């Protein structure tokens, strides 16, 4: 990967070296540095996508099917540990979105993971997912639920309704708990309600894109999974 540079052989390490006469103003990333790093990211993602395409193919044997599931579990683990916790990641996650499109079980597992992280996360011993870090992780997971369901064309109407039902059930439980606390409840807008607001925003976002699928009896026009198991 160190050889991935632009056509002129310019490497990111060149842009990181301010050279003689540098000033404090040059501490901020220059546009050419960003362009080089973006080019490398594109090249890495392209190489990864081509590798995964060669690996998955159309399953013609049990070994190939097993390999596909193993790769998906690896990607899902990397997404949960790294991408989900990365602030404003805007590109790398689309490798995960693409792989999830290959099989309806992958899409279900991905959504299940996101819903679990956002709605039902329970801190466990020996992890750092406590307090504010756990809240941030849950907010990020809710945001991914919204963008994934709203924009993934292969997510059908029934799945969309299932996701929104889970989100609304969580919101309803939060409102009941808030009412039960009475005067001791944190005021609206307090940090304690951050996850509730994130989930509410997710519902509104999904509604804006998929409101037709939320109607009773709606039939989705989502395309079938191109590489689904036969």
State what each model feature region is.
Residues 93-230:
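Eukaryotic scaffolding regions of large macromolecular assemblies
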Residues 88-91:
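Generic helix N-cap/helix-start motif at coil->alpha-helix transitions
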Residues 1-81:
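Alpha-helical repeat/alpha-solenoid scaffolds of the HEAT/ARM/MIF4G superfamily
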Residues 84-85, 133:
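Solvent-exposed loop and edge beta-strand segments that line ligand/cofactor-binding
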């Amino acid at each position: 990967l160190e050889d991935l540079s632009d056509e002129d052989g310019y490497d990111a390490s060149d842009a990181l070296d301010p050279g003689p006469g540098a000033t404090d103003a040059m501490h901020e990333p220059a546009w050419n540095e960003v362009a080089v790093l973006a080019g490398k990211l594109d090249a890495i993602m392209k190489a990864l996508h081509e590798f995964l395409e060669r690996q998955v193919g159309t399953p013609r044997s049990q070994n190939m099917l097993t390999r596909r599931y193993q790769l998906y579990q690896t990607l899902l683990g990397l997404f949960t540990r790294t991408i989900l916790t990365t602030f404003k990641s805007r590109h790398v996650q689309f490798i995960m979105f693409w792989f999830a499109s290959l099989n309806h079980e992958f899409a279900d597992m991905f959504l299940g993971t996101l819903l679990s992280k956002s709605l039902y996360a329970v801190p466990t011993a020996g992890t750092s997912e406590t307090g504010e870090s756990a809240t941030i992780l849950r907010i990020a997971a809710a945001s991914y639920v919204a963008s994934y369901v709203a924009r993934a064309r292969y997510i059908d109407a029934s799945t969309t309704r299932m996701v929104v039902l889970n989100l609304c059930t969580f919101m309803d439980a939060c409102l009941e708990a808030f009412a039960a606390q009475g005067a001791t409840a944190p005021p609206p807008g307090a940090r304690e309600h951050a996850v509730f607001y994130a989930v509410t925003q997710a519902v509104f976002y999904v509604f804006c894109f998929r409101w037709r699928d939320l109607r009773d009896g709606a039939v989705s026009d989502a395309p079938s999974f191109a590489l689904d198991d036969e």
